[in-house]
Swiss-Prot record:
Cofactor note as given: Binds 1 Mg(2+) ion per subunit.
Gene coding for it: panB
PANTHER family per record: 3-METHYL-2-OXOBUTANOATE HYDROXYMETHYLTRANSFERASE (PTHR20881:SF0)
Lineage: Bacteria, Pseudomonadati, Pseudomonadota, Betaproteobacteria, Burkholderiales
Family as reported in the entry's similarity comment: Belongs to the PanB family.
Protein's UniProt keywords contain Secreted: no
Record EC number: 2.1.2.11
Cellular localization per UniProt: Cytoplasm
Species this chain originates from: Burkholderia thailandensis (strain ATCC 700388 / DSM 13276 / CCUG 48851 / CIP 106301 / E264)
GO biological process: pantothenate biosynthetic process
Protein name per UniProt: 3-methyl-2-oxobutanoate hydroxymethyltransferase
Catalytic center residues: 189 (proton acceptor)
Oligomer status and interactors: Homodecamer; pentamer of dimers.
Keywords: Cytoplasm, Magnesium, Metal-binding, Pantothenate biosynthesis, Transferase
Length: 271
C-alpha cells in the first residue's frame, strides 16, 4: 500500500513551522489517535498530528471533551509516537489538568514522556503565566483561542467567537498575550475570517485555523470529520474529503493539497 512506503522528507520541528510561516507555506494539521493512522497521515505529508481531546467525541462517544483524562491523552500520544512520524506530534492538555502553572507542567511532562513534542491548551490572557512557565522549562506550547470546546458550558454552546467589536478586540489581546508569553503556535477556532486574518497579520507565530478562514498560516480538522465519519449535523467548517476518493489515503492527500494550495477552506467553510 502506498502509505506504507518510506518517506524521505525531513522531520517537522517547531522551528520548521516558523520557517514555513515565513516562507508562506501553509501548514496541514490533522488529529490522530493511533499508530496506523499516524503512519498513513505521515505518508500523506501531514505536517502536524494532534492528539486532541476530540477523542472524547469521536472515539469515546462523549457529547463534550470534558470527560477526557490525562491518561487518555497519554495513551493515544504513545500510540501515535510509536509510528515514529516525521510530523510534529502535539498533544492536548485535557480539562482540569492545567489550572496552575505547576499543574500544567506536570501534565505536560507526562505527555512529553509519552511522545508529544508540543502541548496545546485552551485559553488566552489568563493563561499567559502558564505559557511562560512551560516555555521556560523547555515545553513547546500551542495556544488555542476563539471557540474553546472545554468552555462549552460557559459559552452556552458551540458558538462563533469574536463576532462583536469587543469580542474581536479581546481575541486579539488573547493571541498577543500568549505569543508574548512564548507560545510558538496558536489555533483559532470558529472565528470570523476577517478577525482571524487580522490576528494572523498581527502575530509573528503561525496561526492554525478551524472555521477561521483561509488567511491563517495553516488548517486543522478532526480526522473523522474530514473522512465523513461524524454523527448528526456536519459542522460548517468541515469538508468531507472522502467524497470522490478511492481510499482514506487519497482523501488525506487531497486535504493536504487543498490546504497547501489555499483552496480549503472556502467561504462556505468559514464565518
Amino acid at each position: 500500500m502506498t502509505y506504507l512506503q518510506e518517506s524521505s522528507r525531513p522531520a517537522v520541528t517547531v522551528p520548521k513551522l516558523q520557517a514555513m510561516r515565513e516562507a508562506g507555506e501553509k501548514i496541514a494539521m490533522l488529529t490522530c489517535y493511533d499508530a496506523s493512522f499516524a503512519a498513513l497521515l505521515d505518508r500523506a505529508n501531514v505536517d502536524v498530528q494532534l492528539i486532541g481531546d476530540s477523542l472524547g467525541n469521536v472515539l469515546q462517544g462523549q457529547t463534550t471533551t470534558l470527560p477526557v483524562t490525562l491518561d487518555d491523552i497519554a495513551y493515544h500520544t504513545a500510540c501515535v509516537a510509536r509510528a515514529q512520524p516525521r510530523a510534529l506530534i502535539v498533544a492536548d492538555l485535557p480539562f482540569g489538568t492545567y489550572g496552575t502553572p505547576a499543574d500544567a507542567f506536570a501534565s505536560a511532562v507526562k505527555l512529553m514522556r509519552a511522545g508529544a513534542q508540543m502541548v496545546k491548551f485552551e485559553g488566552g490572557e489568563w493563561l499567559a503565566e502558564t505559557v511562560r512557565f512551560l516555555v521556560e522549562r523547555a515545553v513547546p506550547v500551542c495556544a488555542h483561542v476563539g471557540l474553546t470546546p472545554q468552555s462549552v458550558h460557559a459559552f452556552g454552546g458551540f458558538k462563533v467567537q469574536g463576532k462583536t467589536e469587543a469580542g474581536a478586540a479581546q481575541l486579539l489581546r488573547d493571541a498577543r498575550a500568549v505569543e508574548e508569553a512564548g507560545a510558538q503556535l496558536i489555533v483559532l477556532e470558529a472565528v470570523p475570517t476577517l478577525v482571524a486574518a487580522e490576528v494572523t497579520r498581527e502575530l509573528s507565530i503561525p496561526t492554525i485555523g478551524i472555521g477561521a478562514g483561509a488567511e491563517c498560516s495553516g488548517q486543522v480538522l478532526v480526522l473523522h470529520d474530514m473522512l465523513g465519519v461524524f454523527p448528526g449535523k456536519r459542522p460548517r467548517f468541515v469538508k468531507d474529503f472522502m467524497q470522490g476518493q478511492p481510499s482514506i489515503f487519497a482523501a488525506v492527500e487531497a486535504y493536504v493539497r487543498a490546504v497547501k494550495d489555499g483552496s480549503f477552506p472556502g467561504p462556505e467553510h468559514s464565518f
